């Protein structure tokens, strides 16, 4: 790739840089390029972004698919290039039986976005601290490593291969990931009794002598409930959370649990608070060491209770004040971080590393509402799309199926890609909803199910039993055959053959 232009944006404005033997200089700033690696050394100059523009010598009339900032919101689609479109992390362009892929390696120290049209391809390296310019004060920042590949043939195969180029150190589980999660049948109206009943149903649908399923306790167990901490005990409907973990294990399942680590109603030192929410809860600032210590303490406590899977949620929304679909170049709406010496990406990675270290190697982690490219290598499982539903089929169709198809290339390259649960309630037509169960069970990706108390019929039980049988017997990812023509693919190839679904 030939670099055409390099633009540095500081608090004072735009500076056009000249490249000399892989190095650009401006006052106290040095930008180095080495084999795709981009490093920046800076002094007191407040830095905002670095734009690296390449001449597009590759495609003219391609279809382009890009990733999302965090989860998908039903927006994944192959479409014509548009330079105004901000493309997080990486993209693929398909033309004349070739796929041209451009991206950065996972876990960069800067937020990275791409733009492209028929003439140019631009990487935007965001060096800011939240929305504020960042002075590196003599520090050398290894911002990112650019990678690009060209593949002949199928675009799905190309993107699967490219995801493995971007991430060569994924933290993966061995064996199938499947079981229960009570959110889409209880929606927080839960209890230990309901969890144990749900566990019993999950276990009785599990293949005889098959691998143990998970049973994940979602929101509603904590003392305050209402999607907020503190996280030091169960409420009166749950009691001792360590006892409950042991009961789940004795029933034949692996205990898992949900937590929102940055939100609490506890009285905190005011310095820890990023912002107040809903007039009663506080969002903690992840740039503060003492906040990270508290997060580690909560994760460690849950691990010590005996939970072998921890699903942590909302850290992107609680830090940035926006959902992924709301984010543009100015993606932070919250107050300023207390620590103004790090990039936003470094602050987020520090939080993820804290959670990883506190959980230890014997506890699996699901990241939900976490940043995909920064999660890879830290977490075994990633919720790749926004919530499906136990009450609204249109939501499952939009978020679940679209996400499953278009983020499938990340599965077992970045992490296990979890497109979310099958919510089984009386409010959804089982004749339609069972198709979502089927495509997910055959996909080779995680399969979690929420079973409503009034929806566990003999027919549903038989369908779940068959789905679990499929899920544990296959680790080959399915393929959305018509994904270039259809945002909600109907034709799927899997290890079990070709299926066409009427959604």
PLM features: what roles do these ranges have?
Residues 1-15, 475-485, 498-503:
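Non-catalytic C-terminal accessory domains or segments of carbohydrate-active enzymes
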Residues 1-213, 309:
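Carbohydrate-recognition beta-sandwich/jelly-roll modules
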Residues 34-37, 440-443, 448, 482-503:
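Carbohydrate-binding surface patches
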Residues 89, 211-426, 432, 460-461:
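Aromatic- and carboxylate-enriched substrate-binding clefts and catalytic-loop regions
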Residues 183-185, 220, 427, 452:
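Short strand-loop junctions, especially beta-strand C-caps/beta-turns
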Residues 419, 451-456, 479-484:
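Short coil/turn segments at secondary-structure boundaries
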Residues 439-475:
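Catalytic cores of secreted or luminal carbohydrate-active enzymes
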């Amino acid at each position: 790739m030939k670099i055409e232009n390099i633009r540095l944006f500081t608090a004072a404005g735009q500076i056009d840089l000249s490249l000399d033997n892989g190095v650009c200089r401006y006052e106290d700033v040095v930008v180095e390029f080495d084999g795709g690696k981009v490093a920046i050394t800076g002094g007191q100059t407040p830095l905002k972004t670095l734009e690296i523009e390449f001449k597009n010598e590759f495609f003219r009339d391609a279809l382009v698919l890009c990733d999302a900032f965090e989860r998908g919101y039903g927006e994944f689609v192959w479409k014509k290039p548009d330079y105004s479109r901000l493309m997080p992390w990486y993209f693929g362009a398909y033309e004349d039986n070739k796929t041209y892929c451009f991206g950065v390696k996972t876990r960069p120290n800067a937020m990275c976005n791409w733009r492209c049209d028929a003439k140019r391809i631009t990487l935007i390296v965001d060096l800011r601290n939240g929305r504020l310019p960042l002075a590196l004060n003599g520090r050398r920042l290894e911002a990112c490593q650019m990678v690009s590949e060209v593949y002949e043939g199928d675009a799905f195969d190309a993107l699967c291969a490219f995801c493995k180029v971007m991430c060569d150190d994924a933290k993966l589980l061995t064996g199938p990931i499947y079981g229960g999660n009570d959110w889409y049948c209880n929606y927080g109206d839960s209890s230990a009794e309901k969890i144990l009943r749900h566990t019993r149903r999950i276990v009785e649908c599990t293949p005889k002598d098959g691998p143990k399923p998970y049973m994940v306790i979602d929101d509603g167990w904590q003392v305050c409930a209402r999607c907020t901490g503190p996280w030091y005990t169960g409420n009166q409907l749950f009691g001792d959370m360590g006892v409950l973990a042991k009961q789940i294990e004795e029933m034949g399942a692996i205990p898992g649990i949900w937590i929102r680590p940055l939100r609490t109603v506890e009285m905190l030192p005011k310095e820890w608070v990023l912002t107040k929410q809903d007039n009663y809860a506080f969002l903690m600032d992840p740039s503060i060491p003492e906040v990270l210590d508290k997060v580690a303490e909560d994760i460690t406590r849950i691990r010590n209770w005996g939970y072998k899977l921890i699903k942590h949620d909302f850290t992107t929304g609680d830090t940035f004040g926006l959902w992924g679909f709301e984010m543009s170049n100015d993606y932070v709406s919250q107050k300023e971080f207390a620590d103004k010496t790090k990039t936003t990406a470094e602050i987020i990675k520090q939080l993820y590393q804290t959670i990883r270290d506190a959980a230890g190697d014997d506890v699996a982690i699901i990241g939900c509402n976490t940043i995909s490219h920064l999660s890879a290598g830290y977490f075994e499982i990633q919720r790749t799309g926004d919530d499906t539903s136990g009450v609204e089929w249109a939501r499952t169709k939009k978020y679940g199926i679209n996400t499953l198809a278009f983020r499938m290339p990340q599965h077992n390259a970045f992490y296990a890609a979890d497109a979310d649960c099958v919510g089984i309630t009386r409010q959804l037509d089982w004749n339609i909803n069972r198709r979502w169960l089927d495509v997910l069970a055959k996909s080779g990706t995680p399969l979690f199910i929420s079973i409503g108390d009034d929806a566990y019929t003999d027919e549903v039980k038989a369908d779940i039993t068959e789905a679990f049988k499929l899920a544990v017997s296959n680790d080959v990812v399915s393929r959305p055959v018509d994904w270039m023509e259809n945002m909600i693919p109907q034709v799927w190839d899997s290890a079990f053959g070709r299926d066409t679904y009427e959604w």
